[in-house]
Amino acid sequence: MNYDVILIRYGELALKGKNRDQFEEALVKSVRNVLRSFFKVKVRRNYGRMYVELHGEDAYAVMERLKRVFGISSFSPTIQVDPDIETIKEKALELVRQLNPQPRTFRVVSRRADKRYPIQSMEVNRMVATHILRALPAISVDLHEPDTIVNVEIRTEGTYISCETIKGLGGLPVGVSGKVLLLLSGGIDSPVAGWMMLKRGVTLEAIHFHSYPFTSERALQKVRDLAHKLTKWGGTVRLHVVPFTEIQTAIREKCPEDYLITIMRRFMMRISERVAENTNAKALATGESLGQVASQTLESMDTINKVISIPILRPLVAMDKVDIVDISRQIDTYELSILPYEDCCTVFTPKNPVTRPKPRLAAKFEEVLDVEALVEDAVARTEIEEITTKPKETTTDLF
């Protein structure tokens, strides 16, 4: 079947009231961005609907791209026809005939958005269903759980018929919720956290703490590759690479071993807050899950939070590890995340880290460090890489 138009539906956007136009424009921008290599395609919107006019492009190739776009509730490949009822009946039958496998049951659902159309929706349903039943006596109507729903949308700009509905990612279009800075470690959790934040409509930048020579160039490349995976859903990611060796060395030499992770995380938050301020990010995001490791108890989170004022978003906080792993497989980050390259947290992990650190003790242990000087130096030497949607393409400059 040669489809004419892909009809895009968006559910949550319809609830946004006064901001509706802004949200719809952001979704149009996202759709145009993922379809930019389909030169014949045109994207337009009308109240409550968006249309991708194919002009001969492969409908299924286009729909594969649409599966990456947050903010889409569902979409359907459609044929556009004249509003003449006989034409509607014939084209609906043609669509049902080409389904493989053939459905055993069906239902017709028409929507008469153009109220000038002379036939009521219920009558359109009856006429189209009767025509299909006469031509295909092996199938029957089921109004409750049909194998196939034949959708007929009669609108002022055209009549659209479809038999397939593909579920979209849902969520909100990227860019409508402000900017968030993701702490990207290279493990399983943080890329999933980034993906979930993208689903809530944020623009994503990432920060990574690199401890060369304790961590290798391959560990940094793994993080670049994970950031590249996220560009599939959110576009270009600016990756801030922070030199962290001097800070970790100072902490290891001067602070109690059981508080190493806690103090190290407090430094990460201080640096991340500075970078967020410089990039106009309104929150940090981490891959922490409550109770998963020693540094992710409520007491640890509280002690770490004390040193900054910017919000910290933890989208995985109530998730089980198995659910996080499932998402990482779905978004194709799992195999990268389990590559055996150590990050800055794992190379300095103490044997018995404190699980219920006290903010007062953490602050006292930090008194032997020149906290402000260490933070300022790390921020000054941070490098930025632009991770684009193109394979493994990066550009580097100084922060």
From Swiss-Prot:
Family recorded in the similarity comment: Belongs to the ThiI family.
Taxonomy of the source species: Bacteria, Bacillati, Bacillota, Bacilli, Bacillales
Enzyme category, top tier: transferase
PROSITE patterns: THUMP (PS51165)
GO BP term, pick one: tRNA 4-thiouridine biosynthesis
Major subcellular location class: cytoplasm
Gene: thiI
Summary of the function given for this chain in its UniProt record: Catalyzes the ATP-dependent transfer of a sulfur to tRNA to produce 4-thiouridine in position 8 of tRNAs, which functions as a near-UV photosensor. Also catalyzes the transfer of sulfur to the sulfur carrier protein ThiS, forming ThiS-thiocarboxylate. This is a step in the synthesis of thiazole, in the thiamine biosynthesis pathway. The sulfur is donated as persulfide by IscS.
SMART domains tied to this protein: THUMP (SM00981)
Disulfide partners: none
Name of protein: Probable tRNA sulfurtransferase
Residue span(s) of domain THUMP: 60-165
Binding site for ATP: L183, L184, H208, F209, R265, G287, Q296
UniProt KW RNA-binding keyword: yes
Entry keyword set: ATP-binding, Cytoplasm, Nucleotide-binding, RNA-binding, Thiamine biosynthesis, Transferase, tRNA-binding
GO cellular component, one term: cytosol
InterPro entries reported for this sequence: Rossmann-like_a/b/a_fold, ThiI_AANH, ThiI_fer, ThiI_N, THUMP_dom, THUMP_ThiI, tRNA_STrfase, tRNA_sulfurtransferase_ThiI
